[in-house]
Structure formats: structure tokens, C-alpha cells
Regions:
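Paired acidic/hydrophobic, glycine-rich loop segments that form the ligand-binding mouth/hinge
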Residues: 99-103, 225-231
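Bacterial signal peptide processing site
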Residues: 29-32
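Ligand-binding "clamshell"
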Residues: 112-122, 127-142, 222-224, 236-250
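C-terminal motif of bacterial Sec signal peptides marking the signal peptidase cleavage site
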Residues: 24-27
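An extracytoplasmic/periplasmic, membrane-proximal ligand-sensing/linker region
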Residues: 58, 185-191, 197, 202, ...
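Bacterial N-terminal signal peptides that target proteins for export
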Residues: 1-18
Length: 321
């Protein structure tokens, strides 16, 4: 599970930490300054569809893209960018405090079911299982995009050339003299260090934890670590000096971007809402997401400006003039 998509804290404990923020969101939904008990029937002022993101730039970018597309379809929208970690956003969705969240298939399913019982690299199977898991809260899973953001095993170009590395299985002959850098929770996540041991037989010489993805990128470039776990759409992968190794034994789950929407919002806005999000998903690719992440995270572009530009390039929003 990507560090950009998970906090590493136990779900129940983190939920308790997030309760004040949920109460504030409920107050915003009710249009008053007082907290209200969150409930499935809460609605945004004016019937606006609330589109929320997790607290990292790529999620904000996706929420802005979907939100602007929905607004262009004539539906009132309120964007809640950087709402918080998964432990806040998931309960807010379940309780009807937000209406649309751009999710990641595998991570969303693992949040709800610790043992999903499906072949996780299969997007169709993961989507069906996620739909079943969200059904009790009347939340529907829309059509996934081709775009994915998975855990990626990354080395510098110099290391790849020196050791002849192209795919993750190539590391097996050299891992014993290499240091891996990852998020603190990598030691426990099934798709991180335990999975690399079990599926690929990798026994690294050492492991160094880093709290943020930029710290791991810096450590990799400076030679503090030899291998790093990064998101496959990390904007730094577009700079040319880092190499993403192919997951040739399919350790990582399907992590297609997929909008999840409350049944209440779909009942109110029907085909207009579904059509708006499906139009985005039909054209969103991993390469496009990588480029936009580079623009936002490395080049310093604004999230909303980049979202607007992507929608214009793909004919969803009209170009100016």
C-alpha cells in the first residue's frame, strides 16, 4: 500500500483522531456553525455534490479533475481538497458527508476487508469485491480508469546500468548487498517488504524508513539507499534519472483510479453525474497522471490549473477563445 495513500495508523485509532474534523465537515454540510451528528441524509448547501480528496497532491488533482467535469455538466459542486487521511475520508463517505471520492481499487478494498478473497491484480475482480464491500453504505463503484498508482520498486539509472536491472526479479542476485528505503509501514504491508520477500525472495542487506516520499527520493539520489519504494506515478519518475523496475511476478494489486459515489447523489443527478465521471475515467491514463504529478509536485503547477488544462486537452472542457 502506497505511503501516499495510507497513514500506517490503525484504522480505529486514527478514526478517533479524526472525529473533530468529521464534526466540522458535518457542520459545513448543515450550513450552520454548530456541529451536527453526521448521518446518511446530510446534504451540502444548495444540493451541491461534495467531491473530496485525500491529503496528498495526486488525490487533490484527481478530485479537481472529476469535480470540474461534474460542474461542467451543470451540477453544483463543492470541492473538499486535502480533506484528510483515509481514516477520515472513508467514514465521511460512508456517512454521506461527501458524495464523490476518486479512489484506488486495491487500497480501497484492503481498507474495508483485510482478507479480500479475490485475485488482487485483477481489476474486474477487485472492482466487484469493492462494490460488495461498499453496498451497505449505498455507495456505488463507477467504471475504473486505465490510470493506476501502485507501489513501485525504483533504482537510479546508474544502479540499473551497473547491475543490469530491468525487473524486480533481477534484484534477487544482488539484494543481499543493497539497502531498501521505504515508508515506516513498509515492514508490515503485504505488498511491500513482506511481499518482496515472499514473492520475489528478496533479502535486502538493510532497510531504512522514511516518513515521506520526497525523503525517499532524496535518499535514493544521494546513495543513502540503493532501492526505494515509490509510487508508480511519482512525478520524479518523469525526470529521467530514476528507473522503475517491472513487477514481473505481479506482487502489486490493481490500483486503478476509480470514482466512488453515494447512491443519494446518483439518485439526484442520475446520468449527468455518471456521464461526467465516466468521461474522465475513459481518458485518464497512468502516463497522463505521471506527467500531471510531475507538473504539480516537481514543477510547482497549481492543482486546479493542471486539472483544468487536462480537461481542456481531452475535450471535456472547452478551450478558451
Amino acid at each position: 500500500m502506497s505511503a501516499r495513500r495510507a497513514t500506517g495508523r490503525p484504522y480505529a485509532a486514527a478514526f478517533a483522531v479524526c472525529l473533530p474534523a468529521l464534526a466540522l465537515l458535518a457542520a459545513c454540510q448543515s450550513g450552520t456553525g454548530q456541529s451536527t451528528a453526521p448521518g446518511r441524509g446530510a446534504t451540502a448547501p444548495g444540493g451541491a455534490v461534495v467531491v473530496a480528496s485525500f491529503n496528498f497532491p495526486e488525490s487533490e488533482l484527481l478530485a479537481a479533475i472529476y469535480g470540474l467535469a461534474i460542474r461542467h455538466a451543470g451540477i453544483p459542486v463543492r470541492l473538499e481538497l486535502d480533506l484528510g487521511p483515509r481514516e477520515l475520508v472513508q467514514p465521511a463517505l460512508e456517512q454521506g458527508l461527501v458524495d464523490v471520492v476518486p479512489e484506488y481499487l486495491g487500497t480501497a478494498l484492503r481498507t474495508l476487508e483485510s482478507r479480500p478473497g479475490v485475485l488482487m491484480p485483477d481489476p474486474a475482480a477487485v472492482r466487484a469485491a469493492l462494490a460488495r464491500a461498499l453496498a451497505p453504505w449505498h455507495v456505488q463503484v463507477m467504471t475504473p480508469a486505465a490510470a493506476q498508482d501502485q507501489n513501485g520498486i525504483v533504482v537510479t539509472g546508474a544502479t540499473a546500468r551497473r547491475l543490469g536491472l530491468h525487473k524486480v526479479s533481477d534484484l534477487r542476485r544482488v539484494a543481499g548487498r543493497l539497502t531498501l528505503g521505504g515508508s515506516p509501514e513498509c515492514t508490515d504491508r503485504p505488498y511491500c517488504l513482506p511481499g518482496l520477500r515472499k514473492v520475489y525472495g528478496l533479502g535486502f542487506a538493510g532497510f531504512l524508513p522514511f516518513g515521506t516520499e520526497p525523503e525517499r527520493v532524496t535518499a535514493l539520489r544521494e546513495g543513502v539507499v540503493d532501492v526505494a519504494v515509490l509510487d508508480t506515478t511519482d512525478g520524479n519518475l518523469a525526470t529521467g534519472d530514476l528507473v522503475l523496475l517491472s513487477d514481473d511476478r505481479h506482487l502489486q494489486p490493481a490500483e486503478n483510479v476509480v470514482p466512488v459515489i453515494t447512491g443519494r447523489a446518483l439518485a439526484r443527478y442520475g446520468k449527468r453525474l455518471a456521464g461526467a465521471v465516466n468521461a474522465v475515467s475513459a481518458q485518464l491514463t497512468s502516463q497522463a497522471l505521471l506527467f500531471m504529478d510531475w507538473r504539480v509536485e516537481v514543477a510547482g503547477a497549481g492543482v486546479r490549473a493542471e486539472a483544468h488544462a487536462w480537461l481542456e486537452r481531452h475535450g471535456i472542457l472547452p478551450r478558451p477563445g
